[in-house]
């Protein structure tokens, strides 16, 4: 699982100065302190940012949210359902989320809560920033990843309006999905 999630799940942008051009007209969601701070420096204000006030587990800077901050607890290496619900609320209300614990995997509920056509950015250590264009297929891709997690996956799927008893893809979609994401 860690190996699967360690590789970029979108387009790796090595030169972040390109972000204003790549994100023109997009609603932006960011995950991570460094990614959020760099976006702000470039004049890109995320609708929602998910951060923990640290970088690489050491104390860092406090980010100033334009529309308020919700708080969530999320243990390292997990997606706590309560934290996922806070992220969903933040996406709906254009607020930011400060996480006690680890924010990395909260990119998944952020993506699932976002509208198609938006963009999600998260850092890829020592490589750049990963840009995920949010659409039906990226959502299905991350839902497939969620199915591999331990815990109450069905409750998580229901929270994000997916019926765990229904197939996620139709036959035509499945073939296209396999072309887009062959590693799963």
Curated annotation (Swiss-Prot):
GO term, biological process aspect, one: coenzyme A biosynthetic process
Keyword Nucleotide-binding assigned: yes
EC number: 2.7.1.237
Biological pathway: Cofactor biosynthesis; coenzyme A biosynthesis
Keyword tRNA processing recorded: no
Positions bound to GTP: 33-34, 52, 54, 103
Protein name: GTP-dependent dephospho-CoA kinase
Signal peptide span: none
Keywords: Coenzyme A biosynthesis, GTP-binding, Kinase, Nucleotide-binding, Transferase
InterPro entries, per the entry: GTP-dep_dephospho-CoA_kin
Pfam family of the protein (one): DUF359
GO terms for MF: GTP binding; kinase activity
Family: Belongs to the GTP-dependent DPCK family.
HAMAP family, per the entry: Dephospho_CoA_kinase_GTP_dep
Entry-linked PANTHER family: GTP-DEPENDENT DEPHOSPHO-COA KINASE, UPF0218 PROTEIN TK1697
Function: Catalyzes the GTP-dependent phosphorylation of the 3'-hydroxyl group of dephosphocoenzyme A to form coenzyme A (CoA).
Catalytic activity: 3'-dephospho-CoA + GTP = GDP + CoA + H(+)
Top-tier EC class: transferase
């Amino acid at each position: 699982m860690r190996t699967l999630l360690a590789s970029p799940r979108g387009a790796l942008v090595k030169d972040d100065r390109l972000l204003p051009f790549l994100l023109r007209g997009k609603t932006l969601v960011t995950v991570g302190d460094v990614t959020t701070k760099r976006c702000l420096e470039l004049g890109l204000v995320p609708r929602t940012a998910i951060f923990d006030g640290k970088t690489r587990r050491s104390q860092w800077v406090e980010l100033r949210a334009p529309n308020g901050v919700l708080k969530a607890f999320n243990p390292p290496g997990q997606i706590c359902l309560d934290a996922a619900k806070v992220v969903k609320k933040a996406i709906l209300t254009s607020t930011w989320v400060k996480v006690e614990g680890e924010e990395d995997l909260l990119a998944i509920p952020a993506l699932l809560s976002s509208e198609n056509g938006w963009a999600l950015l998260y850092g890829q250590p020592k490589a750049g920033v990963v840009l995920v264009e949010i659409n039906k297929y990226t959502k299905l891709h991350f839902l497939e990843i969620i199915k591999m997690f331990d815990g109450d996956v069905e409750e998580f799927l229901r929270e994000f309006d997916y019926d765990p008893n229904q197939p996620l893809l139709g036959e035509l979609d499945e073939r296209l999905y396999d072309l887009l994401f062959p590693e799963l």
